[in-house]
Swiss-Prot record:
This is NADH-quinone oxidoreductase subunit N 2. Keywords: Cell membrane, Membrane, NAD, Quinone, Translocase, Transmembrane, Transmembrane helix, Transport, Ubiquinone. It holds the Pfam family Proton_antipo_M. It catalyses: a quinone + NADH + 5 H(+)(in) = a quinol + NAD(+) + 4 H(+)(out).
Length: 539
């Protein structure tokens, strides 16, 4: 793995996140000698400010580096023009650096923006429910997890992918159980760690099989044996010779990798950890885990499946871009998608806790997301990426508002939401928009991305799955509407107004406007996502 000077400039956002995390920790060390509650508050505010500043700077750097800004000439003046229709080219034709281990392509830029944005919102949400001790470690862990998610999305070879998964997972295990005086939070962290460690072991075993497959097929002569390109060549050779043992190894490796990743994104039957962890973790961290972490998992799954296992000979179908590609492992994805939608929706129906219900809702949403993986056509990839972005924004809004309600009333049961429409009309309106978007009600983003993913899956030939998904959408309306019943029609124990801080209120309002924007004018995102799918299909 060769590191060149040009690679440094392409990794500036990652170096920024690492530097800010180090500065947050160092700054806390220099002020830790101060005692008392006031000194702790000062340390926390400093950590929050530095983290937000670093995330904001990294976000702007990604915009500039990704080609979202371009110089425009106006007479004798030059100025920056914000343009998201640029063809993102920041790392050459093949988009890979560090010997192909890190891929800088449109998908990486999109992932950077999504993860950094989600981390920024999460830090804002924690500004009221601050950690009671060691604040610097808390916010540094958020930065490290964000960095790991970027590595997951940009990983072009198996070792980098695994390092990204662990760099994401380990900080999240700690953050889920960070409030040690709360036994529910501690239990959530322990369960998350146990299930996560098991999934990492399963995933690592699948990767070891892929490494053996590439070595078995002699792929070390021209490329790194752990690169996804080597994996793709070795798997294609294995399927070209069905009489040999290589095909069985390739299938077994794929099954282990799917199982390991299914744990990470809570796909049935590997979903059991999700409700307990989501309910027990601090609500602000639940928002981060359920959105950014799951999105990173799906980004990784998309890259690995399309790049490593997307050859027509593996699918047993026509070439990409010429006909449907529904077959082979995509049939397994379709079955898992159907099970995930059904189990998630049915389990959500009897829930009395809003966080736990949204946890099962997130499982069902993972099933809908998997419709974008039932084929390798370009439209399937675009619909998946659009759904992921809309899901991240919407779920972040829903859990974020629950975090604000919990700070005010001390719980997240449906009884705690009773009368919210009278106690905090603005907050109730924002929650309503998020819930209706999750339910797929037009003109919100949730409706349009579901429509796109249904159309793409139908074109791939998975007609039965689309019909099943539409039926599950109808089922989900029941438990989503329970939110509105509690917010607007259930009597509250008190009519005391709920006050929300200026910062969290502005951020939640901005996210709600984005939910509308992605729904009313979804085409503005299409061009960037199209470039992402083109580059991945070409790798």
């Amino acid at each position: 793995m060769n590191f060149q000077i040009a690679d440094f400039t392409r990794l500036i956002p990652e170096f920024l996140l690492l530097a800010i995390a180090a500065m947050v920790l160092l700054g806390d060390v220099l002020t830790r000698w101060s005692k008392g509650k006031e000194a702790l508050n000062d340390r926390t505010e400093e950590a929050i400010s530095m983290t937000l500043m670093g995330l904001g700077l990294a976000f702007v750097m990604v915009l500039i580096q990704g080609g979202f800004f371009s110089w425009m000439q106006f007479g004798d003046w030059k100025f920056y023009d914000f343009s998201i229709f640029q063809n993102l080219r920041s790392s050459g034709l093949d988009g890979s650096i560090l010997g192909g281990a890190f891929v800088v392509d449109p998908l990486t830029h999109i992932g950077r923006l999504v993860f950094i944005g989600a981390a920024f919102v999460t830090v804002i949400l924690t500004s009221k429910a601050k950690p009671s001790n060691n604040p610097a470690e808390f916010y540094a862990l958020i930065l490290f997890a964000t960095l790991g998610m970027i590595f997951m999305t940009a990983g072009g070879e198996l070792i980098m992918i695994y390092l990204g998964i662990e760099l994401t997972s380990i900080p999240l295990y700690v953050l889920a159980g960070y409030f040690r005086r709360n036994p529910v939070s501690t239990e959530a962290g322990a369960k998350y760690y146990i299930f996560g460690a098991l999934s990492s072991a399963i995933l690592l075993f699948g990767m070891s099989l892929l490494l053996g497959l590439t070595l078995m097929n002699g792929q070390t002569m021209t490329t790194t044996p752990t690169s996804l390109r080597s994996v793709a060549t070795a798997v294609e050779l294995a399927f070209a010779n069905p009489e040999g043992p290589s095909q069985g190894v390739a299938i077994l490796a794929l099954l282990f990798i799917l199982a390991g990743m299914a744990y990470k994104v809570a796909i049935v039957p590997f979903h059991a950890w999700s409700p307990d962890v989501y309910q027990g973790a601090p609500t602000s961290m639940t928002a981060f885990i359920s959105t950014a972490s799951k999105t990173a998992g799906f980004f990784l799954l998309y890259r690995v499946l399309v790049t490593g296992f997307g050859a027509p000979s593996i699918l047993g179908t026509a070439a990409i871009g010429t006909s449907t590609s529904f077959g082979g492992w995509t049939s397994l994805i379709a079955i898992l998608a159907a099970l995930t939608m059904l189990v998630g929706n049915l389990a959500a129906l009897p829930q009395t806790n809003a966080k736990r219900m949204l946890a099962y809702s997130s499982i069902a949403q993972a099933g809908f997301l998997m419709l974008g993986l039932v084929g390798t056509q370009r439209d399937s990839g675009i619909s998946l990426l659009m759904y992921l972005i809309a899901y991240t924004v919407t779920n972040l809004s829903a859990f974020g508002i629950l975090a604000l309600v919990e700070d005010a009333v001390g719980g997240t049961d449906f009884s705690n939401l009773n009368g919210l429409g009278r106690r905090a009309p603005g907050l109730a309106l924002l929650l309503t928009v998020a819930i209706l978007s999750l339910a797929g009600i037009p003109p919100l983003s949730g409706f349009f991305v579901k429509f796109y993913v249904f159309i793409a899956a139908w074109q791939e030939g998975a007609k039965w799955l689309v019909i099943f998904a539409v039926s599950n959408t109808v089922i989900s309306l029941y438990y989503y509407l329970r939110f509105l019943k509690a917010v607007y029609f259930a009597p509250a124990e008190t009519d005391e107004p709920i006050k929300v801080g200026f910062g969290p209120g502005i951020v939640m309002t901005a996210i709600t406007l984005l939910i509308f924007g992605l729904g009313i004018v979804p085409t503005w995102l299409y061009g960037v996502l199209e470039q992402a799918t083109i580059r991945i299909a070409a790798q």
